[in-house]
UniProtKB/Swiss-Prot annotation:
One of its GO terms (cellular component) is cytosol. It comes from Buchnera aphidicola subsp. Melaphis rhois. This is Histidinol dehydrogenase. Pathway: Amino-acid biosynthesis; L-histidine biosynthesis; L-histidine from 5-phospho-alpha-D-ribose 1-diphosphate: step 9/9. Catalyzes the sequential NAD-dependent oxidations of L-histidinol to L-histidinaldehyde and then to L-histidine. The keyword Amino-acid biosynthesis applies. It is an enzyme of class 1 (oxidoreductase). GO terms for molecular function: histidinol dehydrogenase activity; metal ion binding; NAD binding. GO terms for biological process: L-histidine biosynthetic process. It comes from the Bacteria. The lineage of its organism: Bacteria, Pseudomonadati, Pseudomonadota, Gammaproteobacteria, Enterobacterales.
Amino acid sequence: MKNCLKIIHWDRCSIEEREKILSRPILDDLSAIKKQVKTIISDVNSLGDQALYNYTNIFDKIKLNNIKISHQDLVKAELCIDVKAKNAIQVAIDNIRTFHISQNISTLNIEINKGIYCQQIVRPIGSVGLYIPGGSAPLLSTVLMLAIPARIAGCKKIVLCSPPPITNEVLYASKICGVQEIFQVGGAQAIAALGFGTETI
């Protein structure tokens, strides 16, 4: 598990460094990528967890013993986060929660004509899977902006996938936002696992 993100001081970067930071690869032909993603999805659907371990080894160059993050991993991650960072995360949580609570829609019951009622009933999705990108830009803000609205909406089960190694910040944010299960798996294989389910996910 990584401890921190790379910090770039924009004002200290040369023009070339800034251009490199802002550049994105150009993808003209997506057919090879689509073919590979279809294979990954098919493998996850048929092989389950074994496909997740295989693709984590191939793409992330990590051989995992377990894709599910343990309670001990969460405790260790929390111990690595300093008080200043915890306070900043809590401020962000409070702000996001305040915003999304104001969006909460209650059930509507409207009499459109005498004796004729229309009703809008709002029900949460029972189970949601969150995907948090990793790699060069693991965003703990994505955890907050997905998990908090899901919790406010009343989703009973919230699970999360992120490529390994998952940063301590992402683990800590997941824990305090009420994510019940965290899996260290990324890419198309994570999305397929969330959609189809595996032995573990």
